Amino acid sequence: MSNISKETVEKVANLAKLEVSETEATAFAGQLGKIIELVEQLNTLDTTNVEPTSHAIDVSNVLREDVATKGLDRKEVLKNAPDEQDGMFKVPTIMEQ
């Protein structure tokens, strides 16, 4: 059985930069203790004949084939640009050199 103290909840909340009241810390301590007890029950399961998996269901790659196609012409792309210079998009300076 795992006991989570109110102090442990407050310490973890502080590390996570979360504010919890005394009432919340007490409530969370009880709730987290119950959650840990439920998870600890999984350790009692016999998994000797269970295949290891990374997904609960079979997952297959459903992406299309990667086929190269002709892209847009530079002039066509730049005609929608708010500003361009030497055949490239011109953007406002955000840093000085």
Curated annotation (Swiss-Prot):
Its EC number is 6.3.5.-
The entry's keywords: ATP-binding, Ligase, Nucleotide-binding, Protein biosynthesis
**Pfam families listed in its UniProt record:** GatC (PF02686)
- The answer to keyword Nucleotide-binding applying to this record is yes
Query: Care to name a GO molecular-function term for this sequence?
Result: asparaginyl-tRNA synthase (glutamine-hydrolyzing) activity
Q: Which reaction does it catalyse?
A: L-glutamyl-tRNA(Gln) + L-glutamine + ATP + H2O = L-glutaminyl-tRNA(Gln) + L-glutamate + ADP + phosphate + H(+); L-aspartyl-tRNA(Asn) + L-glutamine + ATP + H2O = L-asparaginyl-tRNA(Asn) + L-glutamate + ADP + phosphate + 2 H(+)
Superkingdom of the source species: Bacteria
Which biological process terms from the Gene Ontology are attached to this UniProt entry? glutaminyl-tRNAGln biosynthesis via transamidation; regulation of translational fidelity; translation
PANTHER family documented for this protein? GLUTAMYL-TRNA(GLN) AMIDOTRANSFERASE SUBUNIT C, MITOCHONDRIAL
Family as reported in the entry's similarity comment: Belongs to the GatC family.
Q: Which NCBIfam families match?
A: gatC
Subunit annotation: Heterotrimer of A, B and C subunits.
Query: In UniProt terms, what function does this protein have?
Result: Allows the formation of correctly charged Asn-tRNA(Asn) or Gln-tRNA(Gln) through the transamidation of misacylated Asp-tRNA(Asn) or Glu-tRNA(Gln) in organisms which lack either or both of asparaginyl-tRNA or glutaminyl-tRNA synthetases. The reaction takes place in the presence of glutamine and ATP through an activated phospho-Asp-tRNA(Asn) or phospho-Glu-tRNA(Gln).
Protein name listed in UniProt: Aspartyl/glutamyl-tRNA(Asn/Gln) amidotransferase subunit C
Q: What species is given as this protein's source? A: Listeria monocytogenes serovar 1/2a (strain ATCC BAA-679 / EGD-e)
Its lineage reads: Bacteria, Bacillati, Bacillota, Bacilli, Bacillales
